[in-house]
């Protein structure tokens, strides 16, 4: 088997483009949701980068960022599912590069408890990206011949669930909200809902083509992504409250010491 499935991918794209949709809006409305999602997620990434520079910490877990940027490279430039999607993926990739830079700048502060990681973070990121790129290319070459364009959904949405739960774990393990913000969450959450609406629309109006997104696995990915975003908000409130209590305690002790 070849490591690339370019011919099979081209055939899958032709099949999608040449298959008449049951309703005129089945392709255009989801494209609108995709564009909205792309803009919101880009804003979220930009806010993450700004917060990383400001707080000298970061919100996006490293393994998620490595998975994200390499996925965007694979489906933005190797297996493109259409111009609009490719533009969105390329846009995310550019912002991810800025986010990587912000993370590297914050490394001495974010990883001060582990100088070894701080000193070698650039190398860790490079190795992580190489492994993730290999993973995405291997998955594409293996599954495109059998499921075609479905591979985009089947690989993108698990990463969304992973990002949410990893961000929750990050908040709890750090015990603070440095690098995180409500603006990051709102734009990310609304972007995820817009992307989910894209598939809800397709599932309802074109189940013959997009029914795979409402299989038990598809339901887990779509509902799990939205649900875990809600859990993140609750955890953020909890950690923020603890932060305020600790700050208040420190201030009280400082006043007594005077």
Swiss-Prot record:
The keyword Amino-acid biosynthesis does not apply. It is found in: Membrane. It is a multi-pass membrane protein. The chain crosses the membrane at residues 29-49, 58-78, 83-103, 124-144, 151-171, 181-201, 220-240. Its main location: membrane. Changing residue 31 to A: Does not affect cyclase activity. Pfam families: Pyr4-TMTC. Disulfide bonds: none annotated. One of its GO terms (molecular function) is lyase activity. The keyword Phosphoprotein does not apply. One of its GO terms (cellular component) is membrane. Keywords: Lyase, Membrane, Transmembrane, Transmembrane helix. Disruption phenotype: Abolishes completely the production of macrophorin A, 4'-oxomacrophorin A, 4'-oxomacrophorin D and 4'-oxomacrophorin E; and leads to the accumulation of yanuthone E, 7-deacetoxyyanuthone A, and 22-deacetylyanuthone A. Pathway: Secondary metabolite biosynthesis; terpenoid biosynthesis. Its EC number is 4.2.3.-. Belongs to the paxB family. The macrophorins cluster contains a single gene insertion (encoding for the terpene cyclase macJ) compared with the yanuthone cluster that produces the linear compound yanuthone. Terpene cyclase; part of the gene cluster that mediates the biosynthesis of macrophorins, isoprenoid epoxycyclohexenones containing cyclized drimane moieties. The first step of the pathway is the synthesis of 6-methylsalicylic acid (6-MSA) by the polyketide synthase macA. 6-MSA is then converted to m-cresol by the decarboxylase macB. The cytochrome P450 monooxygenase macC then catalyzes the oxidation of m-cresol to toluquinol. This is Terpene cyclase macJ. The lineage of its organism: Eukaryota, Fungi, Dikarya, Ascomycota, Pezizomycotina. The gene is macJ.
